[in-house]
UniProtKB/Swiss-Prot annotation:
Location of the Piwi domain: 514-834
Any one Gene Ontology molecular-function term assigned to this protein's record: RNA endonuclease activity
UniProt keyword Plastid present: no
SMART domains documented for this protein: DUF1785, Piwi
Ranges of residues in domain PAZ: 246-338
Name of the molecule in the record: Protein argonaute 17
Length: 876
């Protein structure tokens, strides 16, 4: 019955794609997985107390307190609504607003602690100045604004008790949203807001990343309902801001050179500058009261009268919008407006500098969070007082457990055959891979001129020796002598090498097993080109190595590369002892397939690109260590995975079904000779607002794929969403050595499934990894659908165990292995996008824009992986 219900919902979802009301009705029928009985919690692992960056929120009168919501309309709309509302409050608080101090969300909602003396009213606001921009205030083009306030709803704070009772509804969520707006009112007026966080050069030390970029300190705050009641989550953060420098200096930094007077920009430079400047705000030098939004970069004469001598006439102009008009400004007369966050992708050097600033050890982050709370002075916040909100200024202590690490099995020929990792780490010393792969034919190509021929040969020899020592079969001699090639000739070099190799191997009925590729340290797009050609054109498994590692000859690096090569060649590095002995929770009793899914979206500034979905699935049982991966392309920022299940009408074969889920189920059957009776689907990266839609679409696709494999085939499905807790931190008890490691971080395996979790849903926080830098960030697992009726403790144990099965390293990782592989594969798939022609200045790839909607998957712009690689873990 449940399967039929899900199938119906899936069909209805597609037929009602454009009917919002009926779609909401369908979503309301979903019943998310409930929290298992308390008796199942706290049974596994060592109990301990940790602290989290949450602060208790108290309301003066929860039972009879009401918040009033009003719709806001500001006319004309010129982008300064907050300034207009602040002026309205200043002018009308004691008269027209009845003494109320409202909180405004910056868009359409305004909240008050009591009723205003009207249901609907229009105010005329004369805006003489803008507090945070006095220079702009003196030159306002529009001074008179009409603000219309209209009563919308009464929000009873009593409904917040429904969160504690495990029955949240629309009213309780509205109350939570209103309180969040109230507490953000003061920081919004004080600081620069970006992506939900507040930044200021005065909140901490500003670090210069380069001549035009600097990092600002900031903080994030959000009120949330937990089992402990209302909590204010506060975390410190860092972000990159652009200095208010001349645009020509900004452009010169982008190009990493000074702009020459008579040198026009080439097409590549033009596109790079265009991408960087689009969307920014600029001002004219010496005329700071006007701010212009950059729409485009064009080769057109200036259309704005400026009294400047033009030094660089060959440079393009900025196309900007100004009070409904389009004008063109020369680059050299403009400067970057102050307080703009750098939203484009950072290069490796700038990213490393930012990470150095952002990484704070636990005790330092703990201190900075408390300092932020003290600096915000919530007890003196007039809006908090108005609404009767009080904040405790100490971190909340919560219950946690430290889950045990799993025993790992290695090959019996090694000195150590079983090993229990300590603090989430181990190594391959005195151990051998449990199943060694075979590399009987290999070759090496060197694209780095600084790596001499003898150094490259020695590296390949040492790498082969390490592979053999670790348990692999690795041929001593390559098929061909070392090939030296130029980075600019990557495609011809790889094709020629492959042709020469196959001339030797084809008569023997063999193929090239592995290609070792030596790359320069700063190789730009070379890595992506190598992977694209090898995996979508030739059908080769490759292992890329940077020159700095080749020249160092570090045995730990060689051991790490050997692990990756073994996984790519179909071997296993290690296996869980519990899996071999049929003791792995929720896997031992029935054939189980474990999925990992991830969608990667384009970087900011590349809106014309598409999103890429990757789905990997285990191909062995009960070991759950080998995975196969599939990819699909979909519309830009489309969150739900569109390629899970497809129905096609074939004129010859009739209606056929396909999709990534069905293909994985069939490959699992071919590998194990069994149909999986249980499906565990770990879905990475779905935002909270998209959870119902993702569940409806993707769970329906899974059910439909299973139904297409036979009328009686209905495996039990557990659908788990994994979210990166960007702002939830856990701090150890520094006085209890059993709760932290040598870096003062909480120990690997720390799990929290109470206190700060949701009252009625099946969720938990898990820190499965060891961190050597900064403060650990736990991962949040939310079981949305559970037909297997898992117990909380045993499912947490399984999830923790899966973090020890990654083939790419000898330590537990921060997410379950299938999700880690899905992330690697989706990132790799970015390399498969067809190169964009230079003459096309409208986008950065040949993929369709968002306006093309789902047609993106029909364009074929994502090059397909060669069939001989689909069953291999080539993406490691």
């Amino acid at each position: 019955m449940e399967s039929q219900r899900m199938t119906w919902l899936y069909d209805r979802h597609h037929s009602l794609k454009h009917n919002k009301a009926e779609r909401q009705a369908i979503l309301s029928t979903y019943r998310l997985a409930k929290r298992p009985n308390l008796s199942s919690e706290g049974m596994i692992g060592e109990s301990c107390i940790v602290r989290t960056n949450c602060f208790s929120v108290h309301l003066e009168s929860l039972d009879d307190q009401t918040i009033y919501e009003y719709d806001v309309c500001v006319t004309p709309e010129v982008g300064i609504n907050r300034a207009v509302i602040r002026e309205l409050v200043k002018q009308q608080k004691d008269s027209g607003l009845g003494g109320r101090l409202p909180a405004y969300d910056g868009r359409k909602r305004l909240y008050t602690s009591g009723p205003l003396p009207f249901d609907s009213h229009r105010f005329l606001v004369l805006l003489d100045s803008i507090e945070d921009s006095p220079e702009e205030s003196r030159h306002l083009r529009v001074r008179d604004f009409v603000v219309t306030l209209k009563f919308a709803a009464k929000i009873s704070l009593w409904t917040l008790r429904k969160f504690r009772g495990g029955k949240p509804n629309r009213e309780s969520r509205a109350a939570l949203r209103a309180l969040d707006v109230v507490l953000k009112e003061l920081p919004t007026a004080r600081y620069t807001q970006f992506a939900g966080s507040f930044y200021s050069p005065n909140l901490g030390e500003c670090r210069q990343l380069c001549k035009v970029l600097e990092s600002w300190r900031g903080f994030h705050q959000r009120i949330q309902a937990t089992q402990m009641g209302l909590q204010l989550n506060i975390d410190v953060s860092s972000s990159v801001f652009i200095k208010p420098v001349p645009v020509v200096d900004y452009v010169a930094q982008l190009l990493n050179e000074d702009i020459l007077l008579d040198r026009p920009l080439c097409s590549t430079e033009f596109l790079k500058i265009k991408e960087a400047l689009e969307g920014l705000k600029v001002q004219i030098n010496g005329i700071l009261f006007n701010t212009y939004h950059v729409q485009d970069l064009v080769h057109q004469a200036a259309s704005f009268p400026v009294n400047f001598s033009i030094q660089y006439p060959s440079l393009p102009c900025l196309k900007v919008a100004h009070f409904g008009e389009t004008i063109f400004l020369p680059l050299e007369v403009c400067k970057i407006a102050e307080g703009q966050c750098h939203q484009k992708q950072l290069n490796a050097k700038h990213m490393a500098a930012l990470l150095q600033v952002a990484r704070q050890p636990p005790n330092e982050r703990d201190y900075n969070i408390l300092q932020t709370v003290h600096q915000n002075k919530y007890q003196e916040d007039p809006h908090a007082k108005e609404f009767g909100i009080k904040i405790e200024e100490k971190l909340v202590s919560i219950k946690s457990r430290i889950l045990p690490a799993p025993w790992l099995k290695f090959h019996d020929s090694g000195e150590t055959t079983e090993f229990l990792p300590q603090l989430g780490i181990w190594n391959m010393m005195h151990k051998k891979m449990i199943n060694g792969g075979r590399v009987k034919s290999w070759a090496c190509v060197n694209f780095c001129w600084s790596v001499r021929e003898y150094a490259a040969r020695n590296f390949c020899y040492d790498l082969g020796f390490m592979c053999r020592e670790s348990g692999m079969v690795f041929s001593v001699k390559p098929v061909l002598p070392l090939v030296i090639a130029k980075p600019g000739c990557v495609e011809s070099a790889l094709r020629t090498l492959h042709d020469d190799v196959m001339d030797i191997l084809r008569p023997q009925g063999r193929k090239l097993d592995l290609l070792i590729v030596i790359l320069p340290n700063n190789n730009g797009s070379l890595y992506g080109d190598v992977k694209r050609i090898c995996e979508t054109d030739i059908g080769l498994i490759s292992q890329c190595c940077l020159a700095k590692h080749v020249l160092k000859m570090n045995k730990w690096y060689l051991a790490s590369v050997a692990l990756k090569i073994n996984a790519k060649m179909g071997g296993r590095n290690t296996v869980l002892v519990d899996a071999l002995e049929m003791r792995l929770p929720h896997v031992r009793d029935t054939p189980t397939i474990v999925f990992g899914a991830h969608v990667t979206h384009p970087h900011p500034g590349k809106a014309n690109s598409s999103s890429i979905a990757a789905v990997v699935a285990s191909q062995d049982w009960p070991e759950v260590t080998k995975y196969a991966g599939l990819i699909s392309v979909q519309a830009c920022h489309q969150e739900s995975i569109q390629g899970l299940f497809k129905v096609q009408d074939d004129p010859e074969r009739g209606t056929t079904t396909s999709g990534m889920i069905k293909e994985h189920l069939m490959s699992f059957y071919r590998a194990t000779k069994r149909k999986p009776g249980r499906i565990i689907f770990y879905r990475d990266g779905v935002s909270k607002g998209q959870l119902p839609q993702a569940l409806m679409h993707e769970l329906g696709a899974i059910k439909m794929a299973c139904a297409s494999m036979g009328p009686d085939y209905n495996p039990l499905v557990t659908y788990v969403v994994l979210q990166k807790c960007r702002h939830t931190r856990l701090f150890a008890d520094y006085y209890n050595a059993n709760t932290h490691d040598s870096t003062a971080n909480i120990r690997a395996g720390t799990v929290v499934d109470s206190n700060i979790c949701q009252p009625n849903q099946f969720d938990f926080y898990l820190c499965s990894h060891r961190s050597t830098q900064g403060t650990k960030r736990p991962r949040y697992y939310h079981v949305l659908w559970d037909e297997n009726d898992f117990l909380a403790g045993s499912f947490q144990e399984l999830t923790n165990y899966l973090c020890y099965t990654s083939a790419t390293c000898t330590q537990s990782i921060s997410v379950v292995a299938p999700v880690h592989y899905a992330r690697l594969l989706s990132s790799r798939a970015r390399c498969y996008i067809k190169p964009r022609s230079i003459g096309d200045s409208t986008s950065h790839t040949s993929l369709p824009s968002e306006e093309d909607s789902s047609a993106a998957s029909e364009t074929g712009s994502l090059l397909p992986i060669k069939d001989n690689l689909k069953g291999a873990m080539f993406f490691c």
